[in-house]
């Protein structure tokens, strides 16, 4: 079959490449700025077996916890959300006994905390609860331990859901029960105090002002965020340049300077910044 001309061909590859490059937009090295950061501080009040009274030896822990509460309460950039009291009894001893025990530990801990907060004139909501048998805590501690027959104990927990049967099956593993009684179970007899609070960051106005007047007062996330508060490329460039000086080991400011240069049509300058970003990433 003889060749038949259909149409004149064109070489469009170079044109397509140029169009693609012309429309390309390098990725921004984004900040991780959070105005409100949630934090917490924990402390454990420990109890003796089958006891719910708070011993004098535990008052030091309570005092240190209250000191942290006071520090957060007094800080201008922090706000207390609440204080949690989570009281527990270890799984040995039976459900009925441990229910009463855990409830009494919760009540005694909450009373102590309320008294301390009132004395310090701190108004903070308290959320209290108790867990009669802390099987979750037991499983976690056993999992992290190196005790004999660990896998057998964990298998018992997965096989039986009834607490009385669990306890009996574990007691039947006589070779390890004394170790559990000495090393694991005492850690579960506790009231956990949890101070939940927020760290409140600078406002947009504060960040924008500091970025131009005193950028050294800003951390890297705040400084990178400051550049997003303006649409002026010149101001963005100034902020990113300052960020490279304060935080030379963070690639994002170099990357973002490269992005600005590329968008301005300065490919050589953009390439230089991108190479620098790659070298510190």
Where are the regions a protein language model picked out?
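N-terminal targeting segments with Sec-dependent signals, encompassing both cleavable signal peptides
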Residues: 1-281
